[in-house]
């Protein structure tokens, strides 16, 4: 099954657990998810999803994530977590901006989240989507979690990504 890292602003998750997200007093996001400007998009990608309040989640042992992964493991044999890099570091854009140009990188929960998952659920079968902009902290998190990543053979022949995707 596919597990997107983020949920929609109008999702049941945000409605029922607002304390788990970066929301203001009117329950609107303070910042939203996206990607910075790059060679593919001069203004970046503005996804618009509310961001998690990682401090609040850490304080309750990442219970929201544990419940989410537990439920999906009951449905699927293997989970592919989309945008895995967001657990190491994520791009936060001020809510209301029209582009991603004013965003900033923030530190994600890192291994602490996955340690909580492993403590509660053992070792669920997870594949980490690790395509795109990867940094050393993302590679270190992948290694610490011991989750397999993804390789797209077509990317091996695209000079923008170098040789990371070559099969040998």
Question: Where do the protein language model's features map onto the residues?
Answer:
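Alpha-amylase-like alpha-glycosidases and glucanotransferases acting on alpha-linked glucans and related
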Residues: 6-168
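Conserved hydrophobic/aromatic pocket- or pore-lining residues that grip, position, or stack substrates
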Residues: 2
């Amino acid at each position: 099954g596919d597990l997107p890292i983020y949920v929609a602003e109008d999702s049941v998750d945000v409605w029922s657990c607002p304390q788990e997200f970066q929301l203001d007093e009117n329950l609107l996001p303070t910042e939203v998810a996206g990607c910075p400007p790059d060679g593919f998009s001069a203004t970046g990608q503005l996804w618009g999803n509310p961001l998690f309040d990682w401090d609040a989640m850490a304080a309750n042992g990442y219970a929201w994530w544990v419940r989410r992964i537990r439920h999906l493991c009951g449905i699927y044999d293997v989970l592919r977590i989309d945008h895995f890099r967001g657990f190491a570091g994520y791009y936060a854009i001020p809510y209301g901006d029209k582009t991603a140009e004013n965003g900033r990188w923030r530190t994600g929960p890192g291994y602490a989240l996955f340690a909580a998952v492993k403590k509660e659920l053992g070792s669920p079968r997870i594949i980490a989507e690790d395509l795109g902009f990867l940094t050393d902290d993302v590679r270190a998190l992948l290694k610490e979690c011991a989750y397999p990543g993804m390789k797209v053979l077509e990317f091996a022949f695209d000079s923008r990504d170098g040789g990371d995707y070559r099969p040998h």
